[in-house]
Each structure stands twice: as C-alpha cells, then as structure tokens.
Amino acid sequence: FLSVTEPSLLGDGGDLEIRVFISDDFDGELFPRGVVDSDDLPLNVSR
C-alpha cells in the first residue's frame, strides 16, 4: 500500500491508513473442524 501524501507532510507521528476488505461471499469456515489425538497436548477439562 502506498500512501497518497509524502511522509514529510504527515506531521508529528503520522497518520495510520488502513484498508479493510469485507465480503459477504464467504464459502469457507472460520475454524477448521477435526480431531487431534496427541499425548503432548494436555487435557484441560473443568467442571
């Protein structure tokens, strides 16, 4: 991403410019589903 203004013109600390792309066309899942079987991972079960 290239800023439109020169860095010397930003002032004291500068401005934070962020671009966010939001789409409602999402076919995937946010979290993968599956089973992990490992002795290295501790089992944490609370009542």
Swiss-Prot record:
Subcellular localization:
Cytoplasm
> One cellular component GO annotation, for this chain's record?
cytoplasm
Gene Ontology MF, one: unfolded protein binding
Q: Which residues bind ATP?
A: R47
Tell me the domain of life.
Eukaryota
The secretion signal range is none
Q: Extract the InterPro entries matched here.
A: Hsp90_fam, Ribosomal_Su5_D2-typ_SF
> Sorted alphabetically, which keywords does the UniProt record give?
ATP-binding, Chaperone, Cytoplasm, Nucleotide-binding, Stress response
Functionally, this protein is described as follows: Putative molecular chaperone that may promote the maturation, structural maintenance and proper regulation of specific target proteins.
Q: How does it assemble?
A: Homodimer.
Q: Which family does it belong to?
A: Belongs to the heat shock protein 90 family.
* Protein name according to UniProt: Putative heat shock protein HSP90
What organism is this sequence from? Populus euphratica (Euphrates poplar)
